[in-house]
Amino acid sequence: MKVKASVKVLCRNCKIVRRKNVVRVICTNDPKHKQRQG
């Protein structure tokens, strides 16, 4: 899980999800693409 100021989609399987007022990127294809804004 990467913690970044600005999260970006890295591939076509990445999805931007908002959970508990935190923007996250989840990816079904590559777990390395997981990100959290903070």
Curated annotation (Swiss-Prot):
It comes from Buchnera aphidicola subsp. Schizaphis graminum (strain Sg). Disulfide bonds: none annotated. The keyword Transmembrane helix does not apply. InterPro entries: Ribosomal_bL36 (IPR000473), Ribosomal_bL36_sp (IPR035977). PANTHER family: 50S RIBOSOMAL PROTEIN L36, CHLOROPLASTIC, LARGE RIBOSOMAL SUBUNIT PROTEIN BL36C. This is Large ribosomal subunit protein bL36. Pfam families: Ribosomal_L36. GO terms for biological process: translation. One of its GO terms (cellular component) is ribosome. Transmembrane segments: none annotated. PROSITE patterns: RIBOSOMAL_L36. SUPFAM superfamilies: Ribosomal protein L36 (SSF57840). The gene is rpmJ. Belongs to the bacterial ribosomal protein bL36 family. Keywords: Ribonucleoprotein, Ribosomal protein. GO terms for molecular function: structural constituent of ribosome.
